[in-house]
From Swiss-Prot:
GO-annotated cellular components: extracellular region; S-layer
Principal subcellular localisation of the protein: secreted
More about this protein: The calcium binding of this protein may mediate surface attachment by ionic bridging between the S-layer and a specific membrane-associated oligosaccharide.
Residue stretches in coiled coil: none
Compartments in which it is found: Secreted, Cell wall, S-layer
Keywords: Calcium, Cell wall, S-layer, Secreted
Source domain of life: Bacteria
Name this polypeptide is given: S-layer protein
Keyword Calcium: yes
């Protein structure tokens, strides 16, 4: 008939319990209506699509209430939950607008299953003591149905394993802790299980697969006409009201006697529990499930040792076995129609064999030293927690016909027991280490042996780490992966893809291998290609790396010619990776691609003829390339080492770095930096690259390396850098505005000679850049009047660099940056301005001693934010300004003016001065110190309070005050006195015998302003102002 937009709006509004669609949803409904009118969409499809739009509201209420209370809400209940005038937090109100659909299912599930929730009591009774994996497995089968999902193309075992993986449990546990009031472990456990069920309900709703989704869709369709035909004030049983081909059937409980039980045509549940401690699944029992999708729950405290003699089970699709002790079970005979076997125990061993076509999930909590061994089955999942030395073995006697998934968690410091898997189409082994900080756990060695069906293997572990006060130590276990045909000379292998996430010493042996995915921490990896005598048809290996760091080599262990990989493709993604060594004897081509940096610290590949990099971030090759190898760079920042290459090397568009060990290249050789700001690193004794046409396209010249020293012509370069060197280094012909950056501690003096230093205002910029304290050595600059020094800390840990500067023409030194600087100012007698006021960071102390020798010269010295040490000249008149830190300002003579700045400063008086040439302190304040050790020439000034000031009449002169303060005999023990005169305060140290102030023997320090020193006290000749 074709729908109108108004009709679909009405249907939506009814299904949404009266809440009309918003503008965007209305546009969607208009599109559906138009499609029915043009023939692009059937009426049924348009209505179905319309009603799916209330999955995040109405469907949430229907499904969660059905699962946790046994009935869906009545019409009135749905009105209250979905769109109510009295419920201010219904599903269409602002409160839930921030919730995605899945989180709405989780929220409703937790609220119903815990605390005072309507289903809390029943949920606790059913799920307390049940593992997370078992919760997921049974809920998945109940909500979606294993058979239904399998028919729809879903890998049920993989889905269950994914939902019950430890990372998801950890996430949901953290979510529950953060978003609920629960603190007790039991409450949190139940809330996490409810959240898992909410996740499955959402998955069913999104996919539309399973009984819950089908019945819910039918109920919403019923609502869409404005009335609920099945309404019941007590709630609507979803499956009774909207029956499908498979609905909940009967619950049949076994007795301690011999039982013969037959299910209905619906989905029945058989319960084999205990009666007065006695098992109810006993000798001779016969269980027939009938036509539905049926479940047998076998629960007993005692060990399960086998199916009791004579027991016959048929037509039951799922068997859940829970024991308080060990489980030994074989369902490969005596059981027909079984598609899922789920076993669960705690603190005990499991030995389980599943029959053909049976998906097996074996869950063990607190496994400890107990062993788990499973055989047979289709898709097999083994999930163990609390493992110590217990081993895990899969397929030793009979391999799974489908996938194999093993997860093992160990929180102790006992080495995890070995894990061994044989067979399976795709094998996944995941280890999780949860030991405490400052302890070390060695993870399990993993052995995977393929069979003729095994094509892919994944092994992951928690990344290795060294134990410390805040770090848990982890050691990765060895990994051995062997194809079933590895030993065959005639049969080709099957394992084509291997994924390793953190690994110890690892080996892979398969002639079919084409792809290896690596991440995390790794020790070493050896890749073999089996014993196949024929040359492998695929000689290309793809290594996908993501955040990988290895301590050893990745080795193609096939040494025979033409037997190893000839092309290796390395792709970096997400996070940068470092491979300590790449060994590939047969490789002729290496391609490096991706969007995360790849570093290969060293490589051994004698046959290699070409390396091509297309990685957008760049690649670093730490070993020198063979002289006959062609390298082609990409758009990223690539870094390589060259000798006397005979090839034309083009670096590409990035900011590249090329290190050369020869100042001249081989015949026909050349290297071009390409676009970008490129660095040419001279690891040679002297160079003149600008004169050699073989070198081009480089903007920065860096001298660094074990052979780096000598004279280097800087002509043509716009920047200079210096690293660790073998000896003294000279940069010549340095152009104007070309600076030098020191990156590492050099050996010997570094001399910079300008191309033209005849001017009187030459400026040179010197940068010290490092993450830790840098000993920059001696830098000599000739003919430079201004030296700008930037001390740059490249991380957040404060440090102080050291530098000796020889710049005898310099008049001004300016220091900036976020690192401190201890500057040795050698021979720079012309400097009249030292300015470190732009240095930031309280840990960035600056040390400077003026070397100015001109009598009466005015010299200005400024400190920065750190605790600086600034020393004036003995001959010049210095103005020293400390800045923000707790500085030390040192007086060595002359008429000086000191300003400490903020912070508790130390004014170190190391020269006596005269009655007219002395130091003035402009901002002496409480907490500051006057260090007078250097001027008390006749014995220590006595400790204790300073006491009262010397006072004279109003007409007294400064000279009279000085005489009065020095009237005592200081020839035996120096005596300190103080007085105030002319609005300022003076401290006198009397070290002479006379009764007057003796200039040159006695000392005076002026404090600007009236500073009361009565309670200030001496300790070891240091006066602390109070």
């Amino acid at each position: 008939m074709a729908y109108t937009t108004a009709q679909l709006v009405t249907a939506y509004t009814n299904a949404n319990l009266g809440k009309a669609p918003d503008a965007a949803t209305t546009l969607t409904l208009d599109a559906y209506a138009t499609q029915t009118q043009t023939g692009g969409l059937s009426d049924a499809a348009a209505l179905t699509n319309t009603l799916k739009l209330v999955n995040s509201t109405t469907a949430v209420a229907i499904q969660t209430y059905q699962f946790f209370t046994g009935v869906a809400p009545s019409a009135a209940g749905l009105d209250f939950l979905v769109d109510s005038t009295t419920n201010t937090n219904d599903l269409n109100d602002a409160y839930y607008s921030k919730f995605a659909q899945e989180n709405r299912f989780i929220n409703f599930s937790i609220n119903l299953a815990t605390g005072a929730g309507a289903g809390a009591t029943a949920f606790a009774a059913a799920y307390t003591g049940v593992s997370y994996a078992q919760t997921v497995a049974t809920a998945y089968d109940k909500i979606i149905g294993n058979a239904v999902a399998t028919a729809a193309g879903v890998d049920v075992a993989a889905a269950v394993a994914f939902l019950s993986r430890q990372a998801n449990i950890d996430y949901l546990t953290a979510f529950v802790r953060a978003n609920t009031p629960f603190t007790a472990a039991a409450d949190i456990d139940l809330a996490v299980k409810a959240a898992l069920i909410g996740t499955i309900l959402n998955a069913a709703t999104v996919s539309g697969i399973g009984g819950y989704a089908t019945a819910t869709a039918a109920m919403i369709n019923d609502l869409s006409d404005g009335a609920l035909s099945t309404d019941n004030a007590a709630g609507v049983n979803l499956f009774t009201a909207y029956p499908s081909s498979g609905v909940s059937g009967s619950t049949l409980s076994l007795t301690t006697g011999t039982d013969t039980l037959t299910g209905t045509a619906n989905n029945d549940t058989f319960v084999a529990g205990e009666v007065a401690g006695a098992a109810t699944l006993t000798v001779g029992d016969t269980l027939s499930g009938g036509a539905g999708t049926d479940v047998l729950n076998w629960v007993q405290a005692a060990a399960v040792t086998a199916l009791p003699t004579g027991v016959t089970i048929s037509g039951i699709e799922t068997m859940n076995v829970t024991s308080g002790a060990a489980i030994t079970l074989n369902t490969s005979s005596g059981v027909t129609g079984l598609t899922a076997l789920n076993t669960n125990t705690s603190g005990a061993a499991q030995t389980v064999t599943a029959g053909a076509g049976q998906n097996l999930t074996a869950t063990t909590a607190a496994q400890a030293a107990n062993n788990v061994a499973v055989d047979g089955g289709a898709n097999v999942t083994v999930a163990s927690t609390g493992v110590t030395s217990g081993t895990t073995t899969v397929g030793a006697n009979s391999a799974a016909s489908g996938t194999v998934s093993v997860s093992v968690a160990n929180s102790s410091t006992t080495t995890t027991g070995a894990i061994a898997v044989t067979g399976g189409t795709a094998v996944t082994v995941a280890q999780t280490a949860g030991n405490a900080v400052n302890t070390t756990l060695t993870q399990a060695d993993v052995t995977v042996t393929g069979n003729s069906s095994t094509t892919a293997v994944t092994v992951t572990q928690t990344a290795a780490a060294t134990a410390g006060a805040t770090v848990a130590g982890r050691v990765n276990g060895a990994v051995t992966i062997t194809d079933s045909a590895a030993a065959s000379a005639t049969t080709a292998g099957k394992i084509a893809t291997v994924t390793l996430g953190s690994f110890g010493a690892a080996t892979i042996d398969s002639s079919a291998l084409t792809t290896v995915n690596l991440s995390g921490t790794g020790t070493s990896l050896g890749i073999g290609r089996g014993a196949l005598t024929a040359t492998p048809t695929a000689n290309t290996l793809t290594l996908n790396v993501n955040g990988l760091t290895t301590t050893g080599a990745i080795t193609d262990s096939e040494a025979a010619a033409d037997d190893g990989f000839t092309t290796i493709n390395i792709a970096g993604s997400t996070a940068s990776s470092t491979i300590a060594s790449l060994v590939a004897a047969d490789a002729t081509t290496l391609n490096i691609s991706g969007d995360a940096r790849v570093t290969i610290t060293s490589h051994t590949a004698a046959a290699l003829t070409g390396i091509t990099v297309t990685n957008s971030v760049g690649a670093t090759l730490g070993a020198e390339l063979a002289t006959g190898l062609v390298f082609t760079g990409g758009a990223g920042a690539d870094s390589i080492l060259l000798g006397a290459t005979t090839k034309a090397i083009v670096m590409g568009a990035g900011d590249d770095t090329v290190t050369v060990s020869s100042a001249t290249l081989g015949a026909g050789g050349s290297v071009n930096g390409g676009d970008g700001t490129d660095v040419l690193v001279a690891n040679v004794n002297g160079s003149s690259f600008s004169a050699d046409p073989a070198f081009g396209g480089f903007e920065t010249l860096r001298v660094a390396g074990a052979a780096a020293q000598g004279s280097h012509n800087a002509n043509g370069f716009t920047a200079l850098q210096l690293g660790a060197t073998a000896g003294a280094t000279t940069f010549t012909n340095v152009a104007v505005n070309v600076g030098l950056t020191v990156l590492a501690a050099p050996t010997g003096t570094t001399t910079v000679t300008l191309a033209n230093a005849t001017g009187t205002s030459d400026v040179f910029n010197l940068t010290l850049s490092s993450s830790a304290a840098l000993a920059a050595g001696t830098v000599a600059l000739a003919g430079v009047e201004t030296v700008n020094i930037a001390a740059t800390d490249t991380n957040t840990t404060a440090h102080v660099d050291t530098l000796t500067l020889q710049a005898t023409s310099a008049k001004s030194i300016v220091v900036t940056g976020n690192a401190g600087l201890n500057l040795t100012n050698t021979g720079n007698t012309a400097v009249t301005s030292f300015d470190a006021s732009a240095v930031t960071g309280t840990g960035s102390a600056v040390t400077f001693v003026s070397a100015n020798t001109t009598v009466g010269e005015v010299v200005t010295i400024r400190g920065g934010a750190g605790a600086d040490s600034l020393t004036g000249s003995a001959t010049a008149n210095d103005t020293i300004i400390g800045g923000a830190g707790a500085d030390t300002l040192v007086y060595t003579g002359g008429t000086d003016t000191f300003t400490g700045g903020t912070g508790a400063d130390i004014f170190d008086i190391n020269a006596i001065g005269t009655s007219t040439a002395f130091v003035t302190i402009t901002d002496a304040a409480v907490g500051d110190k006057l260090d007078l050790v250097g001027i008390s020439t006749n014995g220590a000034i006595a400790d204790g309070a300073f006491g009262a000031a010397v006072t004279l009449g109003a007409a007294a002169t400064l000279a009279q005050y000085l005489d009065a303060a020095a009237a005592g005999d200081g020839s035996g023990t120096s005596v300190a006195k103080w007085f105030q005169f002319g609005g300022d305060t003076y401290v006198v140290v009397d070290s002479s015998a006379g009764a007057t102030f003796v200039s040159g023997a006695d000392a005076v320090i002026k404090l600007t302003g009236l500073v009361t020193l009565t309670t200030s006290a001496f300790a070891t000749e240091v006066l602390t102002l109070a």
